[in-house]
Amino acid sequence: MNTQAWITHFERNTRLNDTLELPTETCTLPDATRVPLAASIATFQLGESGTGSRLRRYAREVAPLENFRGYQRAIDLFVAEEQSHSRLLARTVEHLGGKLLTKQWTNSVFRRLRFLVNLEFAIQVLLTAELIAEVYFGTLYLRCSDPVVNKVSHKLLRDEMKHLAFQRDFLSERISTFNDLGRWLWRAQFQAIHAITATVVAWDHRHTLRALGVNPADFRQRCLQAWTRYQERLESEVVKLDQSTIRLPHESQPSGQTQPDFASATAHHAP
């Protein structure tokens, strides 16, 4: 895993988030859209606001391994970028005239699940949230006319796509060490957790989705499609590692450092 490339990326990108200039126009969305949208974004804002202390602790377990040197630093910067997302979303909620949350039931469930087992499971739960966030911010980007919401969702969509690639780089190396049964079990539980979570999120944010002209069932289906695309790419990376007995850092760029497929990420959100 080319952790140094990710360290460089996160160091640069987090600064861009904190200095992002937002439009100064007053929100003109009708209350029927503005009110549920503010509450919905506040939920995602809370989810991005964690300190990542337990994730960092898990990361320390693999950081000494040869192919994960620098991973601890990369995780620290990843968490810092998540917190920069929280600050951006807080500005968006304020723009919409909403209130920030200190607790919310789905967020509490995510946090508890994330630390039940080990680093791989923690990343799996985190991945579920990020795959759904990719669909969510893609929906806002294409469906919401407010310039602040549009700009923030555009930026966060691109960042989430990078986060997914970062996690894929890590997981492909870890899963390549599993036997066939371990891989099957990992895939099955990942798919089940993601499907359940997508159903819950679609229901929890149904008022916002409908205000934007999106059927919650369609949103859920897009989330499931996002999982399928991601899993296919992850398995492709694992196969590449299986076929290579020696992988030197200078022989190839990590999968996460290719240009993000932004067109693909937004295409399935189009009306």
Residue ranges and their predicted role:
Residues 1-271:
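Non-heme di-metal
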